[in-house]
A protein has these predicted regions:
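Copper-binding active sites and cupredoxin-like electron-transfer domains
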Residues: 1-891
Length: 891
C-alpha cells in the first residue's frame, strides 16, 4: 500500500489550516529501495533548510521539516510525484481556510510576461545521428548495447515514436514559431518560461493534439481556477484542462514568497508539465523548464545576468509503453502481434528510453562553451522510482549551493541549478552515474574550447607535492569471514538467515569468497614492500589507499598493473594531465598519472575544509569497479594537511564506500564459478534469478554483517567521515549512526544522524565522538540491512584502553561485547558517572563555581576596603604631623 500515514487516495483526514498562519510539516519516510518519494504540495510554497521549494525529497529514515505560510484558500493536493506511487494512491488533500483573514494585497510591480504554447504531435527520433556520439558505433550494430532500442524488426519499434511536445509561438494566432538557435538542445522539452519576483505570467495554451492536456507549474503562485491538475474528490474543480483543439489561458504570479530565498541563488530552476493524466502525459513528452529569479536578475532578453551559457537538461526514462501513443507506434511500425506475445518483457524494455532531453547515446546536440565561461546547468528529473540519476560532468566540477561536486542528484520532480566554470578544455561526457542507465544511453557530449580573446581571470600555480605508488593486484576476497554477528543479531540458523543466499556455497551458489582485483599502496617504485594496513587504515577494507591533496598540489600516481587484464586509474574532481580518457596499463606495465588540483577541485565556499572524491579503473568503468578497483580521494584547502598527510583539524578520518558489488558483472565471474561453484560441470545457471541475486554483495568497504574492522575512536575526538556511493539505481543508501550525531553542510551546517547517499555522490560529515560504547552503523533501506550492509564503530572512553583495545577484532565483533565497559558512562575524578547524570553534575559544578566566585569577590572587596582605610589613616597622620611642624616653625 502506497500510503501517507496509512491512508491512500486522499483518505487522510484533518489536514486543515488557516491562510496566512505559519504551518510546520514534519515529513519522514521508511521502507525499501522503492521508497524514493517526492512530496509535491500543490498551490503553496515551502521553505526547507532556508531554501524555497514546493517539493520535499523523502527516503527511508530521512526526516524533513518544511515551513509553509499558506496563501490561497481551497482544497489542495499533496502527492508523491514518483509515477507508480502517484498511480497507486500516495495522495492526500489539505484544506486552506480563510478563517476571516483579509488576504494580503500582492504587490506585483513587475512585467506581464506572455507565452503562447501549443501541444503538437510529432514523430520523434531518439537517435537522429544514427550513431553513438561518444563511440561512433552505429546505433543498430548488433551487440552495441544501443541496438536493443534502435534495431527495428517485426517485434521492435526502433528509435522513432509518435510523441507530443510543447512548442512556443509568437502570438495568439499560433502561426509563427519562436526560433532560438541556442535552444536547439532542448529537444523534447517545451520552451523556457522565465519570470522575476513581482511578475505575472500569462500562458495561452492551444491543445492541437488528440488528447486532453494541461499545463501544471512548479514554483509559482496560482489560484484554484488556474490549476492544471485534475481532482476527482467531487468537491474541488476538475482542473483547467484543454480539450483537443481548445485554447485556455493560465495566469500565474511570482510574489516575494514564491521567489528565491536569501540562501538561494539568484534564479531557481522549476518545471511545468501536463497533469490531465500526469503519468501518460509526461511519458508522451509534455514537460518544459521554468526559471524564477530575483527581481533584476534577468537581462532584457530574459537571460540570466552574470551567466555566459545556460543549458536545460531533463534526465528521465521515457516509458513509451505508458505513452498515449503506444498503440499508434505499434501500428506505424507494423509489428507482428504473435512475436510480441512471445517476448512481452523484451518488447517493453526496448521501449524504455534512457534519455537526456529525449536523446540517447550522445545524440543530444553538442553543448559548446568557452574555457572560463560561467555556465548554468538547469537539471530536471521525472519518472518513477528507478529514475534516481547521479548527473556526472566528466572533466570539470560544478558548484551546488556553494558546495563543490562532480555529480548532481535528481529524482522525479526535482530541480537543480549547478554552476560550472570550465577550465579543462576538451570534449567530455555528461552521463548518469547509475551503470545500467549509462549503458542504456543516458549520456551526452559537451565541448570546452579555448576561445580567442577569451581569457579566464585565474592563473594556477601548481607544485609537486605527493607521490603514491599503487599496484593493482588480484586477491581472493571474503565478504563475510565471520558469520557470528549475522546469526546472533538476526537470531536465526544459517539456512533461515537473511544472509544465507549471499553467504552459502551450496545449491550452485558461490558463497562469500570471490577473486577480485584491488588497489594497494607500496613504499616506492620497486613495488616490493607493501605499505601495511594497520591502525587508521585498517577500515579501508577492499578500497585502495586514501589519497590526499590540497588545492595547488600535483599528485603523482605511479601505477603498476600486476593483474591479468588492462586496468587504469581515473579520479573524479581533479585535472588529469592526459587528454581524454586515462591510458590503460597492460598486465605487468607501469604508468605514471599526474593530477593537478586547481581551486575548482577543492572545497567550495559552503563546504567543509575538505571534500571527498573517488578514483577507480576506467578501462570499463562498470566491470572494473565491480571487480574491486576503487578507492577514496580527499582534497583540502591549503594548509589543512599535516606533513604526514593527515588533517590538522581532525583527529581521525574514515572513508566508507556503500556499494552493492554485483559479482555478475565482475571480470572474474567465470573463474569464481569454476573455483567456488558446484563441482559438476554445467550445474551453475548464470542466468538463474537466485544465482544472480546471490552475487550482489551489499557491502561497506567490501564487508558484510559487521566484518569491517578498524572504526575505533576516542571520546572527544574530532572525526571526519568520507561517505561514498557508486553503483546502480538500487544503490540508494540512508546511513544511520546509532548513538552519535554529526554535522553536515547544505549551504549551512545541520545536525543529523542519517546521511543520504546515491550513485556518484560523495559526502563529508564531521562528528565529535561523545558516547562511549560499540554502536551500529547501517543502511536503513530494509533489503540492504537484511543483506548485510551494517557494521560497528567503537568510541573508547579513555586512553588506557589503547594498550588492550586497538581495533575491533573477532573477539569484540558483537555489539554486546563492549557494552559493559563504560558504555553510557563517563569517567570523572576516577569514578564512572552515567551519561544521563552528567547534565545534573555539570549544573551542580557550575552553580558551585558561581557561588565560590561570589564568595571570592566578596572577600576580595572586604580586603580592598580594609586596605584603603589603613591607607587613609596613614595619610591623615602624615598631614597632621606636617601641620604641627609648620606651627612649630612659626613660633
Amino acid at each position: 500500500m502506497h500510503a501517507i500515514n496509512g491512508f491512500v487516495f486522499g483518505n487522510l483526514p484533518d489536514l486543515s489550516m488557516c491562510a496566512q498562519k505559519r504551518v510546520a510539516w514534519h515529513l519522514f519516510g521508511m521502507g525499501n529501495e522503492v521508497d524514493v518519494h517526492t512530496a509535491f504540495f500543490h498551490g503553496q510554497i515551502l521553505t526547507i533548510r532556508g531554501h524555497r521549494t514546493d517539493v520535499a525529497h523523502i527516503f527511508p529514515a530521512t526526516f524533513v521539516t518544511a515551513e509553509m505560510v499558506p496563501q490561497e484558500p481551497g482544497t489542495w493536493l499533496i502527492s508523491c510525484q514518483v509515477n507508480s506511487h502517484l498511480r497507486d494512491g500516495m495522495q492526500a488533500l489539505y484544506q486552506v481556510k480563510s478563517c476571516s483573514m483579509t488576504p494580503p494585497m500582492n504587490q506585483l510591480t513587475g512585467k506581464v510576461r506572455q507565452y503562447f504554447i501549443e501541444a503538437r504531435e510529432i514523430l520523434w527520433d531518439y537517435g537522429p545521428m544514427g550513431h553513438d556520439g561518444s563511440t561512433g558505433k552505429n546505433l543498430k550494430e548488433p551487440g552495441s548495447g544501443s541496438d536493443k532500442f534502435f534495431q527495428k524488426s517485426s517485434s521492435r519499434i526502433g528509435g522513432t515514436y509518435w510523441k507530443v511536445r510543447y512548442e512556443a509561438f509568437q502570438d495568439e494566432t499560433f502561426q509563427e514559431k519562436v526560433q532560438i538557435e541556442e535552444n536547439t538542445h532542448l529537444g523534447i522539452l517545451g520552451p523556457v518560461i522565465r519570470a522575476e519576483v513581482g511578475d505575472t505570467i500569462q500562458v495561452i495554451f492551444y491543445n492541437r493534439a488528440s488528447q486532453p492536456f494541461s499545463i501544471q507549474p512548479h514554483g509559482v503562485f496560482y489560484e484554484k481556477d488556474y490549476e492544471g491538475t485534475v481532482y476527482n474528490n467531487g468537491s474541488s474543480n476538475l482542473g483547467l484542462v484543454a480539450k483537443p483543439f481548445e485554447k485556455v489561458t493560465y495566469r500565474w504570479t511570482v510574489p516575494s514568497h514564491a521567489g528565491p530565498a536569501a540562501q538561494d541563488p539568484a534564479c531557481l530552476t522549476w518545471m511545468y508539465f501536463s497533469a490531465a493524466d500526469p503519468i501518460r502525459d509526461t511519458n508522451s513528452g509534455l514537460v518544459g523548464p521554468l526559471l524564477v529569479c530575483k527581481a533584476g536578475a534577468l537581462n532584457a532578453d530574459g537571460k540570466q545576468k552574470g551567466v555566459d551559457k545556460e543549458f536545460f537538461l531533463l534526465f528521465t526514462v521515457l516509458d513509451e509503453n505508458k505513452s498515449w501513443y503506444s498503440n499508434a507506434n505499434q501500428a506505424t511500425a507494423m509489428l507482428d502481434s504473435r512475436l510480441l506475445s512471445e517476448d512481452v518483457k523484451g518488447f517493453q524494455d526496448s521501449n524504455r528510453m534512457h534519455a537526456i532531453n529525449g536523446f540517447l547515446f550522445s545524440n543530444l546536440p553538442r553543448l559548446d562553451m568557452c574555457k572560463g565561461d560561467t555556465v548554468a546547468w538547469h537539471l530536471l528529473g521525472l519518472g518513477t522510482e528507478t529514475d534516481v540519476h547521479g548527473v556526472v560532468f566528466q572533466g570539470n566540477t560544478v558548484q551546488l549551493q556553494g558546495m563543490r561536486k562532480s555529480a548532481a542528484m535528481l529524482f522525479p520532480h526535482t530541480f537543480v541549478m549547478a554552476i560550472m566554470q570550465p577550465e579543462n578544455p576538451g570534449i567530455f561526457e555528461i552521463y548518469c552515474q547509475a551503470g545500467s542507465h549509462r549503458e542504456s544511453g543516458m549520456k551526452a557530449i559537451y565541448n570546452v574550447s579555448q576561445c580567442p580573446g577569451h581569457q579566464p581571470d585565474y592563473h594556477h600555480r601548481y607544485q609537486a607535492a605527493r607521490i603514491y605508488y599503487i599496484m593493482a593486484e588480484e586477491v581472493e576476497w571474503d565478504y563475510c569471514p565471520d558469520r557470528s554477528w549475522e546469526l546472533e543479531w538476526h537470531n536465526q540458523s544459517e539456512k533461515d538467515s537473511y544472509g544465507h543466499i549471499f553467504l552459502s556455497n551450496q545449491d550452485g551458489l558461490l558463497g562469500s569468497r570471490y577473486k577480485k582485483a584491488v588497489f594497494r599502496e607500496y613504499t616506492d617504485g620497486t613495488f616490493k614492500i607493501p605499505r601495511p594496513r594497520t591502525g587508521p587504515e585498517e577500515h579501508l577494507g577492499i578500497l585502495g589507499p586514501l589519497l590526499r591533496g590540497e588545492v595547488g598540489d600535483i599528485l603523482t600516481v605511479v601505477f603498476k598493473n600486476n593483474a591479468s587484464r588492462p586496468y587504469s586509474v581515473h579520479a573524479h574532481g581533479v585535472v588529469e594531465s592526459s587528454t581524454g580518457w586515462p591510458l590503460a596499463a597492460d598486465p605487468g606495465e607501469v604508468l605514471t598519472y599526474q593530477w593537478n588540483i586547481p581551486e575548482r577541485s577543492g572545497p567550495g565556499p559552503n563546504d567543509s575544509a575538505c571534500v571527498s572524491w573517488i578514483y577507480y579503473s576506467a578501462v570499463d568503468p562498470i566491470k572494473d569497479m565491480y571487480s574491486g578497483l576503487v578507492g577514496p580521494l580527499t582534497i583540502c584547502r591549503k594548509g589543512i594537511l599535516e606533513p604526514y598527510g593527515g588533517r590538522s583539524d581532525m583527529d581521525r578520518e574514515f572513508a566508507l564506500l556503500f556499494l552493492i558489488f554485483d559479482e555478475n558483472q565482475s571480470w572474474y565471474l567465470e573463474e569464481n564459478v569454476a573455483t567456488h561453484g558446484a563441482q559438476e560441470p554445467g550445474r551453475v545457471n548464470l542466468w538463474n534469478e537466485t544465482f544472480l541475486e546471490s552475487n550482489k554483495m551489499h557491502a561497506i568497504n567490501g564487508k558484510l554483517y559487521s566484518n569491517l574492522r578498524g572504526l575505533t575512536m576516542y571520546q572527544g575526538e574530532r572525526v571526519a567521515w568520507y561517505m561514498l556511493a557508486m553503483g546502480q539505481d538500487i544503490d540508494l543508501h540512508t546511513i544511520h549512526f546509532h548513538a552519535e550525531s554529526f554535522l553536515y553542510r547544505n549551504g549551512e551546517s545541520y545536525r543529523a544522524d542519517v546521511v543520504d547517499l546515491f550513485p556518484g555522490t560523495f559526502e563529508v560529515v564531521e562528528m565529535v565522538a561523545s558516547n562511549p560504547g560499540t554502536w551500529l552503523m547501517h543502511c536503513h533501506v530494509s533489503d540492504h540491512v537484511h543483506a548485510g550492509m551494517e557494521t560497528l564503530f567503537t568510541v573508547l572512553s579513555q586512553r588506557e584502553h589503547v594498550s588492550t583495545i586497538t581495533t575491533i577484532t573477532k573477539e569484540i565483533g558483537k555489539a554486546s561485547i563492549l557494552r559493559n565497559i563504560g558504555e553510557g558512562n563517563v569517567r570523572v575524578l576516577g569514578m564512572w558517572i552515567p551519561v544521563k547524570n552528567m547534565e545534573i553534575l555539570a549544573s551542580l559544578l557550575i552553580a558551585m563555581s558561581i557561588i565560590l566566585l561570589l564568595i571570592a569577590l566578596a572577600l576580595g572587596g572586604v580586603i580592598w576596603c580594609q586596605h584603603r582605610q589603613r591607607k587613609l589613616r596613614r595619610n591623615r597622620r602624615s598631614i597632621l604631623d606636617d601641620s604641627f611642624k609648620l606651627l612649630s616653625l612659626k613660633q
